[in-house]
Each structure stands twice: as structure tokens, then as C-alpha cells.
Amino acid sequence: MGKIIGITGGIASGKSTVTNFLRQQGFQVVDADAVVHQLQKPGGRLFEALVQHFGQEIILENGELNRPLLASLIFSNPDEREWSKQIQGEIIREELATLREQLAQTEEIFFMDIPLLFEQDYSDWFAETWLVYVDRDAQVERLMKRDQLSKDEAESRLAAQWPLEKKKDLASQVLDNNGNQNQLLNQVHILLEGGRQDDRD
């Protein structure tokens, strides 16, 4: 059974810098967002569940989901929002569990990048959880720059997620990304070396 490490963060906290680096080092990293994207493609399990529930009107002429329409149907109705959260949560969890079991057979150590790791109770899946952390002010600034948002828009997006301060208390390792990229990746190096040392002990 391989050692499984969960990675999480917040919008614009620098998580992709860490996961890209881990892939360059030869590690397998499961990307929960990419899994969801696949599931929402025509023929995917989420696609089928959504069409069965909402009907053919949510399919565009090219066969893809009409995401703006879907979002308005879900977010304008609390019952639909609850249904969506539950059904999507179940299907995504099942798919991630299958990937986890497959990789555990072949990998000594691997990672799973799950944005809502703590919010959706994935903690007990992992030997360790790594949080890519950044101060709130820096997070707002980076998000404004990355997505060309106003300060209010950036604040509003961040308000929809748990604050990183809260996640900091739950993570087993905190990667501080308030400095530059080299400082961040140096912390990853140290954790990887520590993990290899633990495996040898």
C-alpha cells in the first residue's frame, strides 16, 4: 500500500506550482478538478446524472453541457443546489476512490490534489495533508492580477471558500507561499526528503 498525501490550498495560493513540481519529480498527482471535468463530458457519469435530472435542455448543439444554464438552474433553487452537491459529491468521491486504489497498488508514494479536501471530509484518506498557504492580502492581490478582477470581485470569490487560516489548523504540513517560488519549492524538497527518510526507517 503506497503512502498517500493530500494537497489543498485556496484560489491563487500557488497549489499548481507545487503539483507541477511534484509531477516533474516523477510523482503521480491525481487532479480532482480534471477528474470532475472528465465526468462532465458527454458520456461521463456526471453528465448522464445531470441530463437525467434536468433534461435535454441543458445540452448544447455540440453535445456539451450548457454550463451557464446549468449554473442558473442549480443556484437559483436551494433544493437543486442540495441535490447537485450530494449527487456530484458521491460520484466524484467514488471516482477518486477508484483512482486511489489503483495507484496504491503501483506507487510507493503519490499525491491527490483536492481543492475542497477539508470541506468535503477527505482528510482520513491521507497519511498527510499539505496545505499551500498564503496570507489573505497576498491571495487577494494575486487573484486580482491573475483573473483581472476588482478587489470586491476577488474578495467575493474568496468568501465562498473556507479561509486558509482555518485550513492551516487542520493540515499536517503547511507550505508557506508568501515568499518566492524557490522558497516554496525548497519547502517541498524538505518534506519529500523527510518522507523518504521515514520510508527507510
From Swiss-Prot:
It catalyses: 3'-dephospho-CoA + ATP = ADP + CoA + H(+). This is Dephospho-CoA kinase. GO terms for molecular function: ATP binding; dephospho-CoA kinase activity. The gene is coaE. Pfam families: CoaE. Its main location: cytoplasm. Keywords: ATP-binding, Coenzyme A biosynthesis, Cytoplasm, Kinase, Nucleotide-binding, Transferase. Catalyzes the phosphorylation of the 3'-hydroxyl group of dephosphocoenzyme A to form coenzyme A. InterPro entries: Depp_CoAkinase, P-loop_NTPase. One of its GO terms (biological process) is coenzyme A biosynthetic process. Belongs to the CoaE family. It comes from Streptococcus pneumoniae serotype 4 (strain ATCC BAA-334 / TIGR4).
